[in-house]
Amino acid sequence: MAAAAGDADDEPRSGHSSSEGECAVAPEPLTDAEGLFSFADFGSALGGGGAGLSGRASGGAQSPLRYLHVLWQQDAEPRDELRCKIPAGRLRRAARPHRRLGPTGKEVHALKRLRDSANANDVETVQQLLEDGADPCAADDKGRTALHFASCNGNDQIVQLLLDHGADPNQRDGLGNTPLHLAACTNHVPVITTLLRGGARVDALDRAGRTPLHLAKSKLNILQEGHAQCLEAVRLEVKQIIHMLREYLERLGQHEQRERLDDLCTRLQMTSTKEQVDEVTDLLASFTSLSLQMQSMEKR
């Protein structure tokens, strides 16, 4: 019998037998030649101090507790064997539904500083926080991101910094406004141009459905009313409007219209008097009105 047990040790067996109340021993085969271990044998072993098992365990080297350990392990599937060795508290923690951890207090403070710095036009702090890994898309309780604040303030440099670090130009705040909407409401033409280049949607500028063409027309009407401004200020504003419209029409695929704007921009650069600038302004206003009419016809 001992020899048979030794043979069983050489070839481990697993699984259940067909005999009632008997099963194969795993993971260490301490069985007879049939590969079976009887619960009756185990009971008699406990009652007789282990004598009933000595002959079936390689000459009595194993104690009844060793067989108890084997019985405890044998019905466990492989994944359960590891579980038996893990403390109960750790198992309970592992069984809890996985919850995504939010930002730490330090990170929350950094994100708030990013928004505050963008709102305060603090370019250096914004750049440092972005380089330190602050998320440019993080919003406050009203859904406003640093890009919303910078766009509303008209700070083109901060807007470009945020876009370069992954800010979403189409992210909406709690009221549904995108950064492009806010830049348009505050008449910040250069910011609109930067946002358009950064991937802002061009299908509608704000909740009222106004486009950069509407904004350009309004701005040009103000310039045509003749408010007292120096020549350079008027030229700069007209140039900004041309750049915005050129980017907008390029996004719409209207390349021929963009070429006309390029011609106007060249003429603007050659102006030296206010009358010449006014002439370019009038041409640009006519171009804008015509483009709006064409858009209205296309929608019909």
From Swiss-Prot:
Recorded GO cellular component terms are: cytoplasm; midbody; nucleus
Q: Where is this region: Disordered?
A: 1-27
Locate the region LYN-binding.
141-241
Major localization listed first in the record, in broad terms: nucleus
- Residues bearing PTM N-acetylalanine: A2
Q: Name one GO molecular function term.
A: protein-containing complex binding
| Motif Nuclear export signal (NES) in this chain | 283-293
Please indicate the residue ranges that the annotation assigns to the motif Nuclear localization signal (NLS). 99-117
Q: Where in the cell is it found?
A: Nucleus; Cytoplasm; Midbody
State the oligomer form and interacting partners.
Interacts (via ankyrin repeat region) with LYN (via SH3-domain) in an activation-independent status of LYN. Forms a multiprotein complex with LYN and HCLS1. Interacts with TSN2, VAV1, DBNL and LASP1.
Q: What is this protein called?
A: Ankyrin repeat domain-containing protein 54
User: Which species does this protein come from?
Assistant: Homo sapiens (Human)
This protein's gene is called: ANKRD54
